[in-house]
Curated annotation (Swiss-Prot):
Location relative to the cell: Secreted
Residue ranges of the TM segments: none
Annotated gene: SPH4
Pfam families: Self-incomp_S1 (PF05938)
Glycosylated residues in this chain: N71
Protein name: S-protein homolog 4
Assigned GO CC terms: extracellular region
UniProt main location, coarse: secreted
Family: Belongs to the plant self-incompatibility (S1) protein family.
Amino acid sequence: MTTMLKTQVHVVVIYLLIQIAFSQVKPGSDLKWSTLKSVVTITNRLGDGSTLKLHCKSADDDLGLKILAPNGSWSFKFRPSIVPGVTLFFCHFTWPGQSKWFNIYDDDRDGVRMGIPCIYCIWDIGKYGPCRFSEIDDAFNICYDWNGNRRS
């Protein structure tokens, strides 16, 4: 084998190895998620005319006390951590005679890499717990009990 032919074989082998390595990488969309912002929208659907007070926080951000009239909404935006399972926002909800909490955004549940992903996480807050909008079903049917257990 001539030197030139050996060089060409080496180039082809290296090229094939690079192609195989890149074929094992997930599509580039995973890289783009780190630049997207998620939006959480919370709507008062208590249904009895009660005002809903909520106070949402993460480990880094305190979003302050919000007061929602019946059917009123409030939204916030954030950039989830590029590290899976890290981003968490929890909210304390109160209305006459009640005090509840819920993880309104949990990367393990809502993150784009796992769970039931959402970029626009739209929540209706009812007396029995929060329900998230499903883009697949076009309905608020991803429901949880207070403090996080999924309802069937």
